């Protein structure tokens, strides 16, 4: 009887432990070094307590993850947390009843939410007009310029002074190509996010009407204005000569840089982890601009964490605990310093500065200085469309036709505006 009693007690003990750990699925789109960071952070959180277990689940690219989340919600089987890229923010904000604001989640969990503790530009981007933070900004980034120092030296370019304006970048790309310093002068990830949305903000020109969508959903695109045409025609001309090489619609072009094929890359600061691991002798510069227009301020990219409605109070408490964990200064500082993403709290930023990290790692403060250097204007607060992922797809189709020589920049941008405006109008009416 005693043996039965002991075994029964053990069995009940294990059952209790299994029930006590409330599982919280976190769907995400991170790969490479950034996926390693997610695994490390969730392991650290899970080991810090025994009540909740966060389970990270990779769901593909940013658009694929968003689509998977939408489908899961419709089938009433959503995860507790989903990582949604910046372009999907408008879609999530418009889905009333499908999400619970992050600020509300933190308050439900017994935590005091003080938005003054967070970087203002990041919090504002993921908040309602009344200031309510809707999602937790996990991996916010800013586009910057990376350059291959060895290729610059071979081409006779200044290794310690990367080009600052777009005309200077284009000239450097030509010189790199013609000198044979690298097979390709330059490339860029995310032509939509970097070369249109951030291009607008950084050069203080409108992307669309109605404050780029922040003032209302009825938006008319303005990305066929003369400065855009000049910029994209210059890129198209470089592509004809092979000085610019197209890598793909999202972050694929990063491989062209890490392989040594292209010597200049405009990419998210969040791409730093993979670039650092590649062994390329790289330098960092600010995002290029046009004289007389920029630099103004960049807008956040990357992604934030959204919480689906329909979960239990216990699950929401667990999510609040996890968000609070991610907000800790040491966690934010580590995420920033290892990945290149920006810290979301002022305390983590100040801690990183005090540690001397930026002095030891030149260029690493650049994303933050770009975003916070100037107060935003109507052109540089951000872009918020109810169907921004769809509009990006339209732009990418026209850019790809341009880069393959099927049309010039003006035709590509005119068609993108016409098609994009029609898609926005249809999305609003639906």
Curated annotation (Swiss-Prot):
Compartment(s): Periplasm
Keywords, ordered alphabetically: Periplasm, Plasmid, Signal, Transport
Amino acids binding sn-glycerol 3-phosphate: 62, 86, 141, 268, 302, 341, 392
Chief localization: periplasm
Keyword Transport in record: yes
GO-annotated cellular components: periplasmic space
Signal peptide residues on this chain, from the entry's feature table: 1-20
Cell inner membrane listed as a keyword: no
Family: Belongs to the bacterial solute-binding protein 1 family.
SUBUNIT field: The complex is composed of two ATP-binding proteins (UgpC), two transmembrane proteins (UgpA and UgpE) and a solute-binding protein (UgpB).
Role, per record: Part of the ABC transporter complex UgpBAEC involved in sn-glycerol-3-phosphate (G3P) import. Binds G3P.
Annotated protein name in UniProt: sn-glycerol-3-phosphate-binding periplasmic protein UgpB
Organism: Rhizobium meliloti (strain 1021)
Encoding gene, per UniProt annotation: ugpB
